[in-house]
Amino acid sequence: MCGLAGIINLAAPRSQECTFHILKGMADAISYRGPDDEQYHIDSKVGFAFRRLSILDLVNGQQPFLNEDGSIVVMVNGEIYNYKELKASLHNHMFKTTSDCEVIVHLYEEKGIGFVDDIIGMFSIAIWDKNKNKVFLVRDRFGIKPLFYTELKHELIFASEIKSLFSHPHCPRQFNWKEALSDIWLSGEAASNHKETTSFFVNIQNLDAGHYLEINLTTNERKTASYWSLQDILLRQGYRENLHPDDLIEGYRELLADSVHRCLQSDVEVGLFLSGGIDSAAVAHFAAEKQDLHTFTVLSQSTFTNEDAKYAHWLAKDLHLPNHQVLYQLGNDELLQPESYKHLLWICETPFCGPEQLYKFHLHKYAKAIRPNLKVMLTGQGSDEFNGGYSTTLSPAENPSWEGFIESVNTMEMNRLHRLQGNIFRVWEEHFGLSPINLSYLKSNDSSQADPWQSYVLTKYRDLQMYNCWHEDRIAAANHIENRVPFLDHRLVEWVCGIPDGLRKDLLWDKSVLRKSLTNELHTSYTHRPKVPFFYGKDVRYTHKMMFHLLKKNNYQLIEEAFSHSDASSIIQVEHIHAIMTYLEDDPEFTNFEFLLRLVNMGLLSKMTKETPSVQLDITSHLESITIKDWHSQEGDIASRLNISANKCEGQDILALNPGVTLLRPESDSEHCIYIAEEGFIQFIVSEEDVGAWLHILCDINGKDTLHTILDRHGVSLEEVAKYIQEAIEHNIILIKQKNLPEGAYR
């Protein structure tokens, strides 16, 4: 994990002193990416700045690297996992360090830009070849390491982060509202997306994964080229047609184990984010084969109720690894300060910022505070995208199968093609509720020609670059930590993408290839555990409630700052934002809150872009963790610390309305709803359309009958209404009376 910045003069060069002054500002803007060292290389045409986080060869690994005669200058942000093999293949070269990245300068000498085909790793690279008078900017195959650039009047500048570019006096600083508001994922549209990646800032380019930019300083010609194409890999999908499924599974296991082991190479401490799911469990298992490492888990209301935290505790115990359960409490001011959220948003530099980033930022911060020598963190990112992790989520409830998943993917692809053609055919679908136009006809004007699965994978590939890798890099870097992702070893991804069409159903439904590869490695309680979202799912309301209260803080400070300036006020109707907030406050589920937060993020970024605030790391304050020795015996205490009601309703319990609550029925029976009043004021509306049978159960609560009795009267199971009962308890609408307690004694 390091920070790059550079200036390439395309016309008459400025003085080296002036270049250094500008480069210094660009490097300082991302100093947290490299707190251990700061180096510069400047000549008449090119200036490089490097901020180093030292992980291998702590003493001598300064960059930029030069070849023997100084004609080639290289900066590398990332890790070259096969550097030892590459180094052994390079003869007659003088290596000055034992850093993994120094191998690049000599590999380029031998092979030119084709060197990149030999690398296993994650990287963004800048090469200044004085002999050819060319500069190359190179990015790894999945965009794990960031690299942005912009062309100015007489120069091209590049950096690891956008905020570094903004430090250049001539760089445009303007948020791209049109790009953000029309982004398919930001708006939540259910469509495939194969568009090039974007930065969401005007004239700032995001160098796509698997690409390099070549700048010829003799002709000033610039060209971008692909050296690795996921689409080409997918189009070769039959090249493992002759392999037996067992061989595909075993090959996958071997590659994953090798990738995890390579990701452990370090001269400093390595840690692991342990979620309780199959992905981080796999990484933890293979990592534990080689070394002991501390694991870190989010312990929140959501991860408690979806049992992620519990399974993480159990797995760490089984693997004999220390596990830190980091406590996220709803009312914790450390989490919920507008200024700290703006700090996080500026770290991320994208509207895709929310609770996931908040949780992970503080998890990194905690890890750094209690383990100061920890500089590397392993995560399970990238498994879902290529192993079929979202297949169960995307398949419809009425058809939870691979076929149902493909049906949903087809719909997403149809929506993408409609978009490409300006929605000119969508009116036919609107007439009938389904499209009479053949998907193959829509595809006839689309150059990608991908089948549904391929289209889906290409969409997730873009998502990785725009969301997963982007955030994991920024949040780790802001805490002086490098994030490593074993599932994004290109050999592993190519292996999965080579699974023949006929075997996808068996190996890519619910990540079967991963689960089956661990059959002899982990207990079935881990390998067969269903996928649960990090904080989404049935208890996402806890997280949305936390973020909602953040927006309300200090009299709606974040909303006022986001939309009061001229750029935002001309685009967003602020009064409607406040109306949405009022609506959400009355919605126990805080439905679609994340889309409101993204709009607020856009407004804040638009404002902060003009201010370019600095990013500083402060680990003097951090969240606390809970020491858990036995989950079952401590479960009640854990729930109490999380402010989760211990009053889980059971069938033998007797329910009663809170004495201050009144249920009001509308005059017309056709409305099928009731109004819930507290102390004479209507607070909630409960509609049968929204909650189904719960409406009738609520009306039948009388303080005398057990819940089982009421449920039996209506032919309803406890599972159908348990969520609504818990919500009603949390909002003090109903109380629980246990049998054999005195009259009026409730809990």
Swiss-Prot record:
SUPFAM superfamilies assigned: Adenine nucleotide alpha hydrolases-like, N-terminal nucleophile aminohydrolases (Ntn hydrolases)
Domain of life: Bacteria
Source organism of this protein record: Bacillus subtilis (strain 168)
Annotated family: Belongs to the asparagine synthetase family.
Molecular-function GO terms, alphabetical: asparagine synthase (glutamine-hydrolyzing) activity; ATP binding
Binding site for L-glutamine: 52-56, 77-79, 100
UniProt entry tagged with the keyword Ubl conjugation: no
The enzyme's E.C. designation: 6.3.5.4
Cross-referenced Gene3D superfamilies: Glutamine Phosphoribosylpyrophosphate, subunit 1, domain 1, HUPs
Alphabetical list of PANTHER family matching this protein: ASPARAGINE SYNTHETASE, ASPARAGINE SYNTHETASE (GLUTAMINE-HYDROLYZING)
Domain Glutamine amidotransferase type-2: 2-218
Keywords, in A-Z order: Amino-acid biosynthesis, Asparagine biosynthesis, ATP-binding, Glutamine amidotransferase, Ligase, Nucleotide-binding
UniProt-listed InterPro entries: Asn_synth_AEB, Asn_synthase, ASN_synthetase/amidase, AsnB_N, GATase_2_dom, Ntn_hydrolases_N, Rossmann-like_a/b/a_fold
Residues reported to bind ATP: 395-396
Any one GO biological process: L-asparagine biosynthetic process
Taxonomic lineage of the native organism: Bacteria, Bacillati, Bacillota, Bacilli, Bacillales
Annotated catalysed reactions: L-aspartate + L-glutamine + ATP + H2O = L-asparagine + L-glutamate + AMP + diphosphate + H(+)
Designated name of the protein: Asparagine synthetase [glutamine-hydrolyzing] 2
Pathway(s) per entry: Amino-acid biosynthesis; L-asparagine biosynthesis; L-asparagine from L-aspartate (L-Gln route): step 1/1
Mitochondrion is among the record's keywords: no
Active site: 2 (for gatase activity)
